[in-house]
């Protein structure tokens, strides 16, 4: 069984392309949208608690090293923590894929609490210009809004290809998803360097691959 959880938020709208691609390729899954209101947050948590063990859960949204977030409405409902580090046990005995900033650190620090079968997470994923401006290293490298838009497209492209390959072979263990991600990120990095001459995009993709963990 596959469950996709996506936080509804203007800045994560691009991630709905992943949902659309799974649907168009006839991948069966349950979709849980976390809208910017208390009832939707609670509904999501209630549904997670009811999931059978050994489910594959994909979370698409924002995160920090101590939590993942639900939906946000600008000037209306600021994003709230959906699951904090000490609450990660809600994913016990599940296969967890967290496409969210700093989810690698969250997975590492909550490993004993969460007791997931396996979990995949990432480091920083700068998808907004403010995130670049707040990171001196990225700002000094000259990462532009255009680079960020290309990075968002590349995230979707590599994640979609990896998920489709993984889900279409039901005999594969969850750890193979990381192998597919490494493969497609490497291909996209090579394309950025050799065909597009875009070193900044290649660096962002390299960091995404390098910071990815499985626990």
Range-by-range predicted roles:
Residues 21-33, 92, 113-125:
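Structural alpha-beta junctions
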Residues 1-60, 95-100, 171, 176-181, ...:
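A domain-level signal for caspase-like cysteine endopeptidase catalytic cores
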Residues 61-63, 100-102, 123:
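Short, flexible loop/turn elements at secondary-structure junctions
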Residues 13-15, 40-42, 65-76, 105-109, ...:
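Extracytoplasmic/secreted cell-surface and envelope-processing proteins
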Residues 88-104:
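Short, solvent-exposed linear motifs at loop/edge-of-secondary-structure regions
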